[in-house]
Amino acid sequence: MIYNIALSLVEGIGHKTAKLLLNKFESAEAIFKSSVKDLSSIEGVGQMRSKAFKDKQVLKQAEEILVQHDKQGIDILFYKNPSFPKRLVQCEDAPIILYYKGVAPLNAQKMLAIIGTRKNTEYGAKMTEYMMEQFQVINDLVIVSGLALGIDGLAHKFALKNNIPTIGVVAHGLDTIYPSNHKKLAQEMLAKGGLLSEYPLTSKIELANFPMRNRIVAGLCDASIVVESDSKGGAMITSKLAVGYNREVFAFPGRSIDSRSAGCNELIKKNIAQLIESGDDVLTYMNWTPAQTNNKPKQALLFTQLNEQEQLLLKLIQEKEIIHADELKLKSALSDSKLASYLLQLEMQNIIKSLPGKLYCMR
């Protein structure tokens, strides 16, 4: 493993060139033991870079990294090993080394990236929460995000709340938690999910690393879901990377006057993302079948105890999944006061829940 780590540390050798070398020489050890002449013949290496492989300090640093991570219980994953995320192997610019600590499988049957703005609205928070409640019926699902403020943190939080393993991809060593107010969340994730990075311990926080981190988020997953995003930012970068990797992209639409939905609307308008209104839309599109649950018999028993008007409202909400109060009023022919009263009763009984913008859905 020392030579594998060392290959990722050689100055001037990027991920693509490292893979070219591995394909040519078959192992990292063989690369370091090759002559400067042989190394120079590889495209992207040249004589100056090939000399860097003869720097003994690189191997010493790699050995120190191996010892440090072993002490911390952090797994070091090499590009050629079976434990490396198989979806990421398909991405040309994927790193050759990853550092991982946690219990969630990196090769789960289903993996979704939940991404969005650091400055989410209540609507974005509600949709993230609602989506996770719908995802809890899916077996072998892992949620991936970037542990940032806003939608990222909410995705991790609500995944844990619904007992869904969640992995945070960070842009620095695993000895650092950024932002610092996510330290408690990160500890919970280590117990029920995991933290992943391409950077070894003690690596500094550098702004340039955050956009690079996004390619791992996109590459790890079958699909990326943009909850809220302005027209620029990390979520837009991640979604376009996902398309480049031939992965699905989904986005929640928002009002045209909401800047934090401008990115989502743009992705939908340009046919980069599929429009979704709920997590169920994602499950349907991906053809992921929910596991059997015991919720329906319990709900059916509750529904028989409701009056005729309440049962009608429930039927309307079930048919649409998410429905506006104005549509409920139109189809039920109830007055504003009666409708508000019935909806409140149903919400107090924990059968339905209200969403921002006078929207309602089933719990």
PLM feature segments, named:
Residues M1, F78-R363:
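Glycine-biased, small-residue-rich flexible motifs in mid-sequence functional cores and linkers
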Residues M1-N139:
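Short, positively charged patches
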